[in-house]
Structures are given as structure tokens and as C-alpha cells.
Amino acid sequence: MRVLATIGFSFSAGVFLTALLPWNGWQLYATGGVLLLALAWLFAARKQKYFRRGLLILLPLAVSLAYFAGYDHLVRQPIEDRCGAASDFTATVCDWPQATERGARVTVELEGYHRARAVLYGEAELLAARPGDTVTGTAQWQSAAHFDSDDVTHFNARGVYALLYGREDVRLSAGDGDALRWLPQRAGKAFREKVAAIWDDPRVSGFLTAELTGDKSAMDDGDYLAMQETGLAHLFAVSGLHCAFLVTLLALLISRRQRLLCAVTIPLLLFYMVMVGMSPSVVRACIMQIFLLIAPLFRRGSDPLTSLAAALLVILLCNPFAAASVSLQLSFSATLGMVLLSPRLYKLLTGWYKGKCRPLRTALCFVAANLSATLSAVVFTAPLTAWYFRIFVLVAPLSSLLAVPAAGWSFMAAFVAVLLGFVWLPLASLLGWISWALVRYILWIANGMMSWRYHAVYFTNPYLIYWLLFLYAVFIGCAATPDGKRKYLLASALSVLTLTAAIWVNRQDYQYGVLTALTLDVGQGESVILTSGGETALVDCGSSNSYKDPGGLAADTLHSMGVRELSAVVVTHYHADHTNGLYEVLRRIPVQTIYLPDIEDEYGVRERLVSLAEEKGAQVTYVTKETADTLGDTVLTIYPPVQSGGDLNELGLTALASAGDFDLLITGDMSGSTEKKLVETYALPDIEVLVVSHHGSRYSSNIRFLKSVTPEAAVISVGDNNYGHPSEETLQRLLAVGADIWRTDQQGTIRITVNGG
């Protein structure tokens, strides 16, 4: 019986239930209930066959519920109690700082809080911090688990329980940065610097830095997007693939003697684990590799389920909130899929060939091994990627088959080259050409496949949810019925047919009516899609909520609608909450014309947009006068800024979509005084829909402006914010002119379809 596996999975199940279900004190009652059940089992089932296993399930389950409650009370709650106010802090810097738009941020370990962590935001002086330094001062404490009405699990899953916004008195002082404890962090930085020194091609060095250390900050945005879209981004989550490559490399370099291999490899694996940041995926991989290495020393076979359970147990004991980590869920789900399904799939894929041609059998085994690993991982991770990322990558098996073997060789060659670079850089640069060629090949595969129209499908198409459920039902039915290979062929054919139907039906939904307008739920930002007569335009795309993905949502929605090219992109103004998603849209979807206000901005947004537009072959038009263009059965009119100076909000464009006697007006972030000047400057019609300016700010929606355009409906694009958007005054002014109010923070994405002009 797998005792450790039973204990580990039972404990983990309790932690997952506690972490993912709402906290309202039920855990303590549940602990008592499970203990009573264990007591009843102790007396009632003593002579039963499964008596021992029952106790091994129930007791760890009870312990996990109590452990989570205790951890929350002792570690997280004291920090949570200080949030919402400004107070003093003393902390130790535990990683290298990163630059932000307003200065810098760094992860710190809070003194007096059981080594719990926080992220400190401060001035650019923080960039001088080193791991081990001490930082003190006053900061505004904000919970890392809650942003207004939204619960956010990302920070707590990393052991970060507060966000500290430093005041002017934040002081940095030298600490024990040279201590052995911080050696992995120093080694990680040296590793990244050596990668940049060996490979002067920024695309290659960024790729290899991500592959070797998991740090994706230097990667080309377009390349990382291509890796995500083709199912290859897992190469940058340092995991079993990387640890297996590392162990293989060490086995080739030192010896096959098991004791020596363990003595050298296990400390290096642990050091590498800390160096790359101790993400759940690398911790899981290292523990499983250690089990695999030491099993022969005890004359035992390594059991993957036991090592997987042990890894999960260790991670959740260190931080039970890690159960909410997307990285952990994907890593363990993929590994579980490979453990349970990969051998059966491999047998199924190779069993049909009975020939004796050795080269053909070798090739078949290679293909089958890669496909079985990929497909078995996808079976367990597809629901998670659908839920978290809204995507199902159709080309993942093919992209993995073509790219993953090359990634393995590039990792090993690059690792050796970097180590050699610390000894003799010229020889390392020469060896680096191997990795350069392999990385270029992988990027060629990824970018090429991303250009395929159906490389992936997106769950912004609601019919795909039913398709995915059908897919699992069909193949589970096949697995549960007697053996036979034809049933899998039939199931595959049915899956393709139903997928085609789901795509076609969703696209037909957008062919109805003369105009469809979608105000996407991008949080505190704005993005509006206009489609009419087979042509589509996008007005703005951005969000100030860092946990939102405005560009991904817009591009996914456009792909699901069947949009192959945007006729126009209109940028009302250059603030990030209206533009930071446009870069992904421009990389994923061709654009004919991008309309920009002819004003300068201090953030460099205009320059970046123009550069990317030129790279992608889009025409850039600066709007300096009233401009009208056809969009299928709709006329899209763009008005230039009506003010000659002031804030960027007041110097933006206005877009009017008119389909017959239906009019929809988008005014960006302009204030009421600018709206008033807009109707004084241009003869705007009575409109049916107003996309309310500046997310419903108290300074927007001037009453004279509203009485002039008389909207019948008002759409407010708004999310979590500290500005009080939408303000009660604005809502009352809209109601006063008879407008029905729709809000993305309450109704989600808002769709308006015009049946006739």
C-alpha cells in the first residue's frame, strides 16, 4: 500500500478544499466532523480490509483542515489586521528589485511575522537593494488577497500577504548580503548576466534566460505570445523537463555510479531550485527527481505517485495558500496525467505496428513517446487552461513533438555554455551557437504555427464549454468500455465535427443585425468592439487592473467572432488603461488602419504603437479633422480633440458609430467641460447608446452634454478602483435624462445588437 501517497494526497485534498472554498469558519467544524468520523471508523471497521487505509485518509484530512486554520491565524491574519492603514515596518530584502513605471518594487521578508513576505513599492532608490539588505520606514499596508471587491490568490500563493506602498522615509541599509543564505540569489543574477554576455541576440538571450531560470522579463513580447499560443510556454516554467535535462547532463558529465551521482546531483538540484525562485513546479520536479535518484540506493523502485504526493505535501506544509497557485495546479495536473495515462497511450500508439523495420520502429517510438506525454498532460490540464486562460491549443501535440526535443538540447547546451562562460567566455560564445540555432528553430516553429488560423480556440466562445464537456464524456466512455481501437477513431471524428459546429454557430451569432457593439469587461479600463457587415473595428483596449488581460480578452473574442482582420483601431488617448492591451491585439490580428490623436505623451505609448503598427504593416492616421469611414453597414466617424491643451484625457478622440438611425458614442476619458465643448463644436445626433466617459467619474457626463445627445442607454466600463468610479452624481445625471445604465463590473461584457437601421 502506498502509505506516503495516501497521506500526502489526503492532506492535500483538505488544504485544497480550505484554500479554494470561501472562508467562513467552517474548517474547524469540518475538522471535528472528520475526527468523529475517524473515531467511528476506528471502532466500526477495525476488522475490515480497508481499515488502515481509511485511517490514513481521514486523519491527514482532519490535520490539514486544522493546519490551514492555524497557519492562517498565526501567519496571514496578523498581517491582514495591519492592512488598510499606514504604519512602520522593518524587513529584509529577499530578491533582486525590479523597475516599475513609478520607481521600483522588491520582495521583502517582514520582521516579526514568521518570515512572511510582502512586496514593497517605492522610489527608484530601491533598485540599489541587494538580497540580505535591511529596509525600514513607513508604508501604506494593503492586503495582497483583496483588491476592493475582488479576491486575488496570486500573491498569497507565493507567500506574499501584503503590498507596502512606501512613504518618503523608507531607508535602505546594508545587511548580510554576502551570507551563504543569499548565495542562490547572487548565483541567479550572475547566471542571467552571463547569458546576456554569451548571446548578444536579445531574442535568443531572453529565451534562454527564461528557459534556464524561469525569468521571462527579458523575453521578446511577440515570441512569448507565440509560445503561449502554441502550447510551448511550459518550457519556461522550470519543472520536471528542466530537472530531467539537468540530471541527464550531470550523469553524462560525471559518472553513472549511483552513490556519486546522488552525492553530486541532489545538492545541485536543491541549489538550482532555490536559484530559480522555488516555484511550485520546480520544487515538485526536484523532489520527484530526488526520489528517483535515491530509490536504487535502498533497492526500491521509484513510485511516481508517492513522490508526487510527497512533493505536494512539502509545498503545502510550507505554504498552504500555494494550493491556489495556477502554476502548482498546472504542474501537478500535468504530472498526474503523465503518470496515469502516458503508459497506456504509448502502448495504444505503438501497439498497431507489428513490423520488424528497426528504423521505423525507433521513429514510431519517438513520436509515440512525445505524443503520449503531451496528450496525457493535456487531458488533466485542459479544464484548468480553459478556466484560467480561456484557451484550448489545438496544435499543442504537434508543436511539442517538433519543439520540445530541441528545447532539451538547447537547455543542456546553454547550461554547459554558461558554466564555461565563467571560465573562458570566447569558448562559451562558440559553444553558444548550438543553443542559438536551436532557439531560432523553436521560435520559427512557434511563430509559424501561431499564424495558422485554427492553431487554438478560445472560451470567449461559450459553445466551446459544452464541446469540452462532450469531449471528456466521449473519451471517458471509450476508456470505460471494452477494448477496441475503432471507438477512438469514431470519438475523434465526433470531436472534430462538434468543434467545427461550435465554432460555426458562435460566428453566426455575430452575423445577425446591422451592427454589434461589445463593451468588454476589462476591469478599470475600456475596450469596445464594433462589427458590421463583415468588418470590425476596435476602440481602445486597456486596463489599470494588473490582474486583468485586456489584450488577450479582446484578441480571443475577435478570434471567436471569426475576425481575421481589423478594419480600424481607434485610440482615444494614450493612457495605459485604454492602450496597454493594444500591443497584444496588434501582434495577433492584422490591422488595416490605426487612428491616433496627434498629441505627444510622456509615457512613450504613441511611439510604441507607431513602431508596432509599422512593423505589422498597419497604416497610421493622425486625426486632426472630422474623419468618416465605412465599417460594413455602419459609418464610423472620428472627431479630433476639441481642446488645445491640458491633460491627455481632454486631448482625446471621439468615435461615433451610426447604423441608420442608431448611434453609439464613445468619448474616451474626457471631462464634462470637454464634452460640453464637443457638442458645441460638432453637430452630434441624438444617440441611442453612450459609452460613458472616464468610467463614470464625477467630472464626466456634463448635464448639458447629456441633454444635447439624449442617450437611451449608458454603458459604463469600470472595475476595481480607488477613485469612486462610477460616482453617484454621474449615475443620477444619467438617470435624469432617462438613460438605462449598464455596467461591466456588474453585468460583465455588454453586447448590443442593432437589428435594423
Language model regions located:
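N-terminal leader/targeting segments
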Residues: 1-79, 284
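Core dinuclear metal-dependent hydrolase active-site scaffold
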Residues: 216, 316-324, 447-568, 614-689, ...
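Membrane-interface helix/helix-cap signal primarily in integral membrane proteins
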Residues: 60-234, 552-556, 565, 599-601, ...
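Hydrophobic alpha-helical transmembrane segments in multi-pass membrane proteins
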Residues: 2, 14, 164, 221-396, ...
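Aromatic-rich juxtamembrane segments at the membrane interface
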Residues: 9, 157-288, 293, 518, ...
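Cap/insert and terminal regions of metallo-dependent hydrolase folds
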Residues: 593, 675-749
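Metallo-beta-lactamase
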Residues: 566-577, 599, 690-694
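Membrane-interface amphipathic/re-entrant loop segments adjacent to transmembrane helices
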Residues: 171-178, 182, 189, 229, ...
